[in-house]
C-alpha cells in the first residue's frame, strides 16, 4: 500500500500519521516509539454489518487537508452506519487510532524547535491540548466548556469565580472581580455587585464598573457598537437570567434578572471581561483584538498561531498574589489525536497532555510519567429530543436504551479512566435524590420494554445521533459511540451518526432539536459531554421549559410541569439546604423520565512528564493553569 512504510519489526508507519504530526508540530526526523492501540477485542461484541469504525473507507486528503486546515469552520458530513459508511481521512484515522489493526509502533513527534527556542532564563511548560484549534481569545472562548481553562480564565477574570486550585474537595464560588454580591431584599430580581479596586487590564487601563456594563452589552445587546456575535453565541445561553444592567458608581454594578433567581450567581463564572480601551486601540476590531487581547487575568497572550500554538506569559502584576502563575511561559499546543499527543509527551515535545489514550497509560507510567485524575463533575450522555416524531418520545424506548448499555465494559475500554453513570450526577452528590428508575445493564428488561413499544432486533426503530470527532470533554468519542451503536442494535435501535467537528456540534446544540439543522436532517439525539458542577449547569438548564433552545440549552424540548414548579420554587429559595432538597427532587424526576442515556462520568486524566512537579487537579472541569509548575 502507498500509505504504509515498514521499519524493521516495529510495524507500519502510516503516511497520514506522519502528515498529521508534521502539520501540527513541525518537520524533522521521526523516530519510532512503542504505543499500543486499543484492541477491538475489548469491545463487548464484534462489529456486525460494518460500523462507524469500519476501516478502508473515506474521502481523499490528509488529516491536515480534511480537518486542521479548515480552522473554525465545521466539517459536518452525513455518516451512514452500519452499511455504506463514509468518512473523511481525518475521521477514519482518528477511529483507527483506537480501533482497527493494532500497531506495534507509531511515528514519534519531531522535535518542535520553535517551542524549545524560548530564552533559557524563562521557565516554560508546553501543554498538549485535545482541541483542533486554539479557542477564541477575545474574552468568551469557543470550543466548549473545557476551553475556558485555556483562553478564558487564563487571560480574563469573571465577576464571580470557581475555586479551581484545590483537589481534596469540590470547589465553590469565590470572589473574582466582584468582592461581594447581594440580592436586594425589596426586589429579589436586583443584584448589586461591589467591584474590586486597584485592578488593571493588561493594557494598563483601569477596571471599573463601566467595563462590566460594556462587556455585558458586548454579548447581550446587538445594537451596541462593541457587540460581537461570536462571543455572544458562546455565553448568551450560559447567562439566560440577565434582563438589564447599569452602573451605580465606579465600583458598583447592578444586574436585574428576568425573574427572581437564587441560582443566578452560578451563571457568572462564564462571563469574562475584556478591555474596552484595548478594543478602541485596535480600531474597534474584534479580529485584531484576538491577536493582542487584554484582560485582567494571570496570563497575557504573547503569541497566537491559529491551529498551532498560543503562548501565554505570566502576568507579574496580577491582582491576586495567591494565584500568580508558577511558570513564565505556558505554550498551548493543539493536538487533537490522542496517540499523537501521547507520543509528543513520550518524546519530549510537550510536558503534559490532557486525555491520554487509555491503553497508553501503563506505558506512560512505566516510562516515569505521572497520571493525575480526580472526581469530576462531568457526564457523557445521549441527550434526546422529545418533540413529536422523535423515536425517543416513548419513555419505554428511552429507558430500554439506558438498560442496553454495559457501562462497566466502557469503563474497561477506557482503562478505568471513568466511572459508570447512574444519572446526570454522581451518586455521592447531595442533589442525586432517590430515583425509582435504576440505571444498570439489563438486556432482558431492555428487550422487554422495546417489545412493549412494538420494536425488536428484527423490527428496529431508527434514530440519528449527531456526535463529535473528538475534543476536550468528549473522551474517546468515536470508539465509545461505536460501542453505543452496537449495544443499541442489540435491542432494536438502529443508530445512524452524523459526525462533525466539536465546534459545529455546539452550534447544533445551541440551536435546539427543533432547528432545521437538526430536525431537517432527522437528528433526534446529540452526544455532547456536560459539565455538572453546579445546579444551573447540571440540572435546571436542561429541564426548565423556559430554557428551550434558543432561549437556553433545553435541547430536546423537555417539559414537565412538576419540574418547572420545583425550578420556580428553587429560584426563590435562598437557603442552601432547602435548595439541596429541591435539586434532589429535580434530578430524581430527570432520571425517572430518562431524559438522556447517561453513560459514564469522566475523571479528566492528565499525563505529566517528570519535569512537571506541580499541578493541582481540581474536582471540576475547569483547571487552574496557574498551578502548573516545574
Predicted feature locations:
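Surface-exposed binding/hinge segments that line
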Residues: 89, 194, 232-279, 303
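Long beta-strand-rich cores associated with HINT superfamily self-processing modules
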Residues: 606-630
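N-terminal lobe/hinge region of extracytoplasmic solute-binding protein
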Residues: 129-186, 294
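Append "and occasionally in soluble cytosolic enzymes with long acidic Gly/Pro-rich linkers
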Residues: 311-316, 365, 393-491, 557-561, ...
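Extracytoplasmic/peripheral linker and loop segments enriched in polar/acidic and small residues
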Residues: 399, 411, 494-507, 537-610
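Ligand-site clamp/hinge motif
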Residues: 287-290, 317-363, 494
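Gly/Pro-rich hinge or "lid" segments in bacterial periplasmic/extracellular proteins
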Residues: 163-168, 269-325, 329, 339, ...
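Ligand/substrate-recognition segments at binding pockets and active sites
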Residues: 127, 306, 451-530, 541, ...
